[in-house]
Amino acid sequence: RHRYYNGKHASEFVTVTGLTTFGIDTLPPIVSRGVLLDMAAHFGKPMLEAGTVFNSAEIKAAASAQNVRLEQGDVVLFHTGWLSLSETDPERFMAGEPGLGEDGARYLGELGVVAVGADTWGLDALPGDKADELFPAHQELLARQGVYVLENMDTRALVADGVQEFLFVLG
């Protein structure tokens, strides 16, 4: 409990001046196939509500409906429509969010994806499907699977252009 990547506890790498390891400054560039899953469209809404959780069943169904296949090495981005609230209703934007559940995170990690991101500030649904645990998808992806988490990804242009697969470049 309260462990990070490779089972490390924060006391092993967090100092008052920053991180001694696991810092974003140590991240190598990522160049990979990107896949955008439009979860808002999957649920038939322009924007998902806070607390809407998507897991492996919803991820598989959305990928199938979009006729895309998730593969090892992919960067998977989720469009929920939530990011638009950051401009129009910042208090609501920060009060909760739709997002990935632990089962969905485990599924993606076991596929061998490199990174998972969304147009939300924290990737996990809040409130989530596990009332006793905060950010279980983060824990699954980062600590157990070694998968990078990307937040506040602006997916609106990709959705507007009908893009589902693309070259993802970070770094």
Give the location of each predicted region.
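Active-/binding-site microenvironments in catalytic and ligand-binding cores
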Residues: 1-171
